[in-house]
Amino acid sequence: MPQNEYIERWTKQHGKRLDHDERVRKREARQSHQQSKDAQNLRGLRAKLYQQKRHAEKIQMRKRIKAQEEKNVKSSAPSEPSKTPLPQYLLDRSEATNAKALSSAIKDKRAEKAAKFAVPLPKVKGISEEEMFKVVNTGKKTHKKSWKRMITKPTFVGNDFTRRPVKYERFIRPMGLRYKKANVTHPEMAVTVQLPILSVKKNPQNPLYTQLGVLTKGTVIEVNVSELGIVTAGGKVAWGKYAQITNTPENDGCVNAVLLV
């Protein structure tokens, strides 16, 4: 048994108090009074956090109540079939329609959609601006101007990228830290292929890093998967798919990613 389950272990060894159930019932009955008291008397940040917590609880409670109230509503079908011909799209009207089954199907579709965009690394460690940028001092003689920044992490820039004039370039992306290809692993096919990067979709650190094309751990990139021969539901060959970077490119010297399928 794990070390932190000592209360459960003690209960298994010695049993519960004789009035345990009664005490639990009374504690639950007092809970609503305590919640009301807290809602009325808490002030400041504690009140704000408490209201957020209660708001989330109420939403979950309403969802549960709504799920329980769903009835099996069936459409009334005519007793005798009509002799007049019906078009194809009206033929299923005569069949009984189960409302609960329909709503469940819609919920399943939504859950599938949410799972479709689930990523292998949901949380990543934050990177400070001091670590991301190096201050570049400029100025003709004094070098006192320090508005330029050099990016110290790997980046991606497209083929059509052209640098701004040096005088106006605020963010410098070194050529040695630019990557054009990524080692992408397909989780279902269990193969790793080197694919060209098309764009940086989302950097979890900062929207500015997404705009600059910074490649850090957890970044979602778009890769060209035409070599894999992946076909969409419509029968067309998929061109670009999203993948998430799973390694630390500045340490490894390469970009490793997992395809989001």
From Swiss-Prot:
One of its GO terms (biological process) is maturation of LSU-rRNA. Residues 1-31 have a biased composition (Basic and acidic residues). InterPro entries: NSA2_fam, Ribosomal_Se8/biogenesis_NSA2. GO terms for cellular component: nucleolus; preribosome, large subunit precursor. A motif (Nuclear localization signal 2) lies at residues 52-59. It comes from the Eukaryota. The keyword Ion transport does not apply. Keywords: Nucleus, Ribonucleoprotein, Ribosome biogenesis, rRNA processing. Residues 1-87 are annotated as: Disordered. It is found in: Nucleus, Nucleolus. A motif (Nuclear localization signal 1) lies at residues 15-22. Belongs to the eukaryotic ribosomal protein eS8 family. Ribosome biogenesis protein NSA2 subfamily. Component of the pre-66S ribosomal particle. Interacts with nop7 and rrp1. Interacts with rsa4 (via WD repeats). This is Ribosome biogenesis protein nsa2. It comes from Emericella nidulans (strain FGSC A4 / ATCC 38163 / CBS 112.46 / NRRL 194 / M139).
